[in-house]
Amino acid sequence: MKKLSFQQIILTLQNYWQDYGCAILQPYDAYVGAGTFHPATVLRCLGTKPWSVAYVQPSRRPGDSRYGMHPNRMQHYYQFQVILKPSPDNIQELYLKSLECLGIDLKIHDIRFVEDDWESPTLGAAGLGWEVWCNGMEVSQFTYMQQIGGIECRPVAGEITYGLERLALYIQGVDEVRELDWNGQVGEKALKYGEVDFEAEWQFSKYNLELADSEMLLRHFKDSEDQCERLIKANLPMPAYDECLKASHAFNQLNALGVISVTERASYVLRVRHLARICCTKWLEMNK
């Protein structure tokens, strides 16, 4: 099996899906918990217009802060997201061919689709789904997106989310993310993942778990909530969705700090879901 560098894995996936016909988009410039939160998925999966895109999305999950000490769990990581709308009949075959392009021999390695229906409570999104395991390790999530913002997706979109770090761990045969070959160079030009990201991982973990100001975050949540509602009334669903993302991230930070109770957590989830719903509803009204 070819031992592609981390950036070669990304480039290979971009080239593969570009050749299929996907537009290669850029990461969204906001804090998101997963590639699904990019408006290219949340908003564009709604409505009837065909939409085929692929993109890398840096993602943040404050609750996964481990000061860079966990072998494969981090508060900041990368996903490669593919959206095919409508979902083609051969989407599973397309996915498997993408693995072959990464040097994974399907005749040798055990690839399994393990049923795992997907749901995002804050987005009001759900779909039939499968985890994809390679020799017992999850490397991707495969979902037929059926609902976003509480609105049915017609037609259903196919979503493929590659966990780039886990995929790279398997392809390169290493045990810790920090040891991943980032750029495929040797000597002075060689870079490991840890050299690129792990100082930030430690610093943001300390911030997320110890130093974030909960009172400030509560104010930010309420401010973003109010601003989202105001922008929807002004028929501006895209900047409104940005405010929804800000509220969602503030909630995730509060959750990581452990300052909200179980009951409060459920209330915050419903508030973020409401924001996502009104953004999706307004966007669909304006883009039928």
Swiss-Prot record:
One of its GO terms (cellular component) is cytosol. Gene3D superfamilies: Bira Bifunctional Protein, Domain 2, Class II aaRS and biotin synthetases, domain 2. One of its GO terms (biological process) is glycyl-tRNA aminoacylation. Its EC number is 6.1.1.14. InterPro entries: aa-tRNA-synth_II/BPL/LPL, Gly-tRNA-synth_heterodimer, Gly-tRNA_ligase_asu. Its main location: cytoplasm. GO terms for molecular function: ATP binding; glycine-tRNA ligase activity. It comes from the Bacteria. It catalyses: tRNA(Gly) + glycine + ATP = glycyl-tRNA(Gly) + AMP + diphosphate. It is found in: Cytoplasm. Pfam families: tRNA-synt_2e. Keywords: Aminoacyl-tRNA synthetase, ATP-binding, Cytoplasm, Ligase, Nucleotide-binding, Protein biosynthesis. HAMAP family: Gly_tRNA_synth_alpha. NCBIfam families: glyQ, PRK09348.1. Belongs to the class-II aminoacyl-tRNA synthetase family. Tetramer of two alpha and two beta subunits. This is Glycine--tRNA ligase alpha subunit. The lineage of its organism: Bacteria, Pseudomonadati, Pseudomonadota, Alphaproteobacteria, Rickettsiales. The gene is glyQ.
